[in-house]
């Protein structure tokens, strides 16, 4: 009996221990929940003092208050994500329906001029789509393991092998299609553009790819923030003000395996940092930099083309926080003598604190992308700090490695090797100028310098500015060496350094547009060259087409704080009766780095009246010509590099039948213009 009693006592003690081990749950009262919700709506992150006050008021432990707010924030984030997903799904369905309707309309469209059906290009794009989709079947074991070893310092093994990749040329992945019309940037449709691939990213990525990309992006962001926040000895001053990376200190701070498989003699490294204040709020700036179409419109002189291949993470709604995109970009210098640089990058945005964002770009080895320029982008990007007065402070870092497959032209060696061609200073200077331009675009009143009230309304002013921006974008594509335009190189660099390309005209079914460009050096400062070329009073001294007749400015729109940044409508005097209806639209601009543009196009009077009345200008035909001016980068200083480009229409000829007469015409036009500029400025002909 005693044994049995001992057994019962033992069982009861075990039961008590089990009861003690059970978790005790506490359900808050409706009053407590109501008070907590009220506080949460006012402040989602209460400090310790507020939590202690709530603890005393509601009779809860501070730890319970802390956990309640953590759980409530997680719950609200999940609700927002579900709402975002539903909204995106609805928008995707709407776009899909619109796409189907447009395709059906195109199938049954009839040309009003000839009555024939348009050429069906669906088969071409279907083929490209199939090639891109088939390229997803690749050997993930080797690729992912090598990338992980390079960026994360450890390989990833035991992955299921897939099919070998099918390489797709960058030409098939890029597109430079019509621009979109959005809040700040004007809609445009370049005459050099072609039917674009779908703007919505349609690349399917595995979860393993997404996880790897996220790890690489987070690591790159950490490196970028250290580069932004660290000064000497990591960064050293050159030329008194420019920040250049000390590569030895950098390699000691950041260790990684080589990207090029060993040191090569023709391998170059560029790393620079610059900062400035821009006239745009931080949220708007982040939105522009995270959108590939807006980015191309914002930097037409730098970004030749850009496309988002995949959205790994869309980020928080409204501010792009934690957004991660896989993108392809091609960067250019406005000259036929400098090859472009192509990158496949991960672009990651992170909100560092309230009013501060960081955006990082880092190269990613993607099988479908084969860079012809063999360029590599180390963690680069910018830090954007909102200044609460409509301005933002931007600090930019550019860090890249490139292989010179062909020697850089002697004329451009200094600006390329010193980082002036692709460096941070150029990005900041261009960003400041373009933000001023787009702010002026939104100004409700026309400029006080508008001569004679020719532009009658704010809508007319904005329409003219959009047309001018399309003109600038078209010119930048025509003089560069982008691989992603549908242009054909008719004649490479001849003995005068002139390159001629051709493409089909959007506005003339049987017409071809010839684009000729060359670069030359002048021993004169960029500011003086800019003042000479933009002044309508000196225009007859170099403009072959003006035939020496004087030119008058009939309308003027200011484009920024620099008085030289403006859009002008010019009219020639003593012109023949057939030219009375022809005017010239010109945009001139110069930034803090002394890089300048003077671009113009002839526009007939009826078309200009359409623009001045505020109507759509996307169908007005333009053939931009003009000049791109930059410092020569020489230590002696004072010289300028000028790229001149002309476009002419050739009717009734196919690309293979372009005759020598057309080639001679455009070559003579450039040679005569360059000769007259040098003669007027008292420069030797060999300069």
UniProtKB/Swiss-Prot annotation:
Residues 8-17 have a biased composition (Basic and acidic residues). Disruption phenotype: No visible phenotype under normal growth conditions, but the double mutants hdg11 and hdg12 exhibit excess branching of trichomes. The double mutant pdf2-1 hdg12-2 exhibits abnormal flowers with sepaloid petals and carpelloid stamens in association with a reduced expression of APETALA 3 (AP3) in the epidermis and internal cell layers of developing flowers. One of its GO terms (molecular function) is DNA-binding transcription factor activity, RNA polymerase II-specific. SMART domains: HOX, START. GO terms for cellular component: nucleus. It is found in: Nucleus. Residues 87-150 form a coiled coil. Residues 18-30 have a biased composition (Basic residues). It comes from the Eukaryota. InterPro entries: GLABRA2/ANL2/PDF2/ATML1-like (IPR042160), HD (IPR001356), Homeobox_CS (IPR017970), Homeodomain-like_sf (IPR009057), START-like_dom_sf (IPR023393), START_lipid-bd_dom (IPR002913). Its main location: nucleus. One of its GO terms (biological process) is cell differentiation. Residues 21-80 bind DNA. Belongs to the HD-ZIP homeobox family. Class IV subfamily. Interacts with BBM. This is Homeobox-leucine zipper protein HDG12.
């Amino acid at each position: 009996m005693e044994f049995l009693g001992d057994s019962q006592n033992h069982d009861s003690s075990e039961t008590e221990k089990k009861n003690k081990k059970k978790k005790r749950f506490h359900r808050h009262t409706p009053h407590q929940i109501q008070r907590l919700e009220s506080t949460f709506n006012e402040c989602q992150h209460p400090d310790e003092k507020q939590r202690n006050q709530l603890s005393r008021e509601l009779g809860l432990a501070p730890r319970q208050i802390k956990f309640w707010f953590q759980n409530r924030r997680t719950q609200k984030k999940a609700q927002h994500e579900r709402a975002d997903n539903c909204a995106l799904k609805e928008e995707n369905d709407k776009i899909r329906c619109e796409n189907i309707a447009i395709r059906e309309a195109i199938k049954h469209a009839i040309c009003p001029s000839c009555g024939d059906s348009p050429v069906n290009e669906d088969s071409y794009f279907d083929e490209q789509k199939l090639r891109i989709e088939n390229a997803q079947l690749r050997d993930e074991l080797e690729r992912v393991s090598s990338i992980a070893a390079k960026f994360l310092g450890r390989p990833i093994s035991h992955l299921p092998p897939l099919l070998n990749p099918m390489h797709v040329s960058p030409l098939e992945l890029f597109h430079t299609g019509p621009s979109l019309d959005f809040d700040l940037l004007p809609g445009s449709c370049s005459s050099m553009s072609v039917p674009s691939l779908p703007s919505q990213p349609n690349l399917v990525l595995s979860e393993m790819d997404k996880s790897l990309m996220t790890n690489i992006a987070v690591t790159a962001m950490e490196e970028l923030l250290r580069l932004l926040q660290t000064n000497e000895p990591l960064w050293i001053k050159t030329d008194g003000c420019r920040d250049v990376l000390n590569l030895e200190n950098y390699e000691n701070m950041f260790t990684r395996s080589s990207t090029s498989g060993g040191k090569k003699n023709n391998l170059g490294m560029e790393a620079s940092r610059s900062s400035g204040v821009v006239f745009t709020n931080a949220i708007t700036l982040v939105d522009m930099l995270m959108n590939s179409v807006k980015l191309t419109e914002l930097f037409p002189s730098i970004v030749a083309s850009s496309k988002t291949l995949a959205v790994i993470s869309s980020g928080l709604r409204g501010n792009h926080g934690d957004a991660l995109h896989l993108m392809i970009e091609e960067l250019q210098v406005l000259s036929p003598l400098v090859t472009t640089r192509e990158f496949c990058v991960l672009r990651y945005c992170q909100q560092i604190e309230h009013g501060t964002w960081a955006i990082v770009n880092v190269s990613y080895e993607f099988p479908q992308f084969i860079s012809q320029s063999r360029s590599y982008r180390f963690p680069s990007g910018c830090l954007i700090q909102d200044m609460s007065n409509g301005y933002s402070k931007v600090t930019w870092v550019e860090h890249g490695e490139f292989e010179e497959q062909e020697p850089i032209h002697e004329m451009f060696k200094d600006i390329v090797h010193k980082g002036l061609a692709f460096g941070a200073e150029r990005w900041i200077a261009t960003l400041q100028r373009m933000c001023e331009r787009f702010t002026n675009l939104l100004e409700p009143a026309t400029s006080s310098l508008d001569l004679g009230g020719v532009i009658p309304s704010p809508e007319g002013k904005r329409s003219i500015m959009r047309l001018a921006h399309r003109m600038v974008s078209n010119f930048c594509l025509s003089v560069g060496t982008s691989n992603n335009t549908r242009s054909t190189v008719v004649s490479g660099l001849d003995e005068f350094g002139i390159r001629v390309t051709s493409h089909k005209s959007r506005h003339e079914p049987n017409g071809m547009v010839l684009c000729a460009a060359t670069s030359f050096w002048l021993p004169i400062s960029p500011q003086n060259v800019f003042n000479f070329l933009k002044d309508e009073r000196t225009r007859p001294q170099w403009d072959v087409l003006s035939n020496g007749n004087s030119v008058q400015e009939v309308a003027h729109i200011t484009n920024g704080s620099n008085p030289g940044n403006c859009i002008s409508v010019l009219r020639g005097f003593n012109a023949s009766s057939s030219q009375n209806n022809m005017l010239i639209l010109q945009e001139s601009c110069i930034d803090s780095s002394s890089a300048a543009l003077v671009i113009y196009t002839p526009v007939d009077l009826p078309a200009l009246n359409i623009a001045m009345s505020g109507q759509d200008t996307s169908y007005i035909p333009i053939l931009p010509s003009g000049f791109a001016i930059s410092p020569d980068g020489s230590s002696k200083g004072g010289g300028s590099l000028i790229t001149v480009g002309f476009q002419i229409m050739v009717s009734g000829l196919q690309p293979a039948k372009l005759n020598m007469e057309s080639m001679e015409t455009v070559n003579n036009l450039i040679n005569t213009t360059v000769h007259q500029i040098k003669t007027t400025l008292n420069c030797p002909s060999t300069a």
